[in-house]
């Protein structure tokens, strides 16, 4: 007889679905086999925060993949709001002001901040169009160095 094996809580299942009912159905189907879930922008406006709270009440880990990118004061306050939800992970864009503000906003909570270095959809040509004179690889490496200096917990780099 096979023993029930719990998943590695460091692995997050992306709930990139169009509505919370579909996400709830998937969570129910997976039961205790998955301990950690990512909720992104697609679900944000249709109940993603509330879904995250339901999952936390079930003992699950929550990763809000919201990629904050705003002025420092706004990112700091928004990060503080995410902390009040007892989230485990949050993404922000890897601009120094954004990263520093998110680190400041988390205060003494256990929230881990991940910095998104460069969106995967940006190639050399699209980066040039928005004013960057580096290719994606160079920009990723530069932003990783900045992320380390700013005190975030990890990076999302591809």
Describe these PLM feature segments.
Residues 7-8, 70-158:
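Conserved anion-binding
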Residues 23, 47-48, 98-100:
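Short, well-ordered alpha-helical microsegments
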Residues 13, 37, 67, 90, ...:
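Conserved, mostly hydrophobic/aromatic
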Residues 1-26:
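N-terminal amphipathic alpha-helix/helix-capping segment at the start of soluble metabolic enzymes
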Residues 38-47:
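Glycine-rich, proline-tolerant flexible connector loops at the mouths of alpha/beta enzymes
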Residues 8-10, 55-66, 109-114:
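Short beta-strand/loop segments at the ligand-binding rim of alpha/beta enzyme cores
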């Amino acid at each position: 007889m096979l023993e029930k094996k719990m998943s590695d809580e460091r692995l997050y299942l992306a709930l990139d679905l169009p509505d919370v009912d579909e996400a709830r159905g998937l969570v129910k189907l997976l039961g205790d086999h998955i301990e950690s879930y990512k909720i992104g922008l697609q679900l944000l406006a249709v109940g993603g925060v509330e879904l995250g709270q339901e999952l936390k009440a079930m003992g699950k880990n929550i990763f809000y993949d919201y990629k904050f990118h705003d002025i420092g004061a706004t990112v700091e306050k928004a990060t503080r709001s995410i902390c009040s939800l007892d989230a485990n992970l949050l993404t922000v864009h890897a601009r120094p002001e954004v990263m520093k503000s998110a680190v400041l906003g988390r205060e003494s909570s256990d929230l881990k901040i991940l910095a998104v270095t460069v969106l995967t959809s940006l190639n050399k040509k699209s980066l040039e169009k928005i004013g960057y004179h580096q290719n994606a690889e160079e920009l990723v490496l530069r932003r990783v160095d900045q992320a380390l200096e700013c005190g975030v917990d990890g990076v999302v780099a591809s």
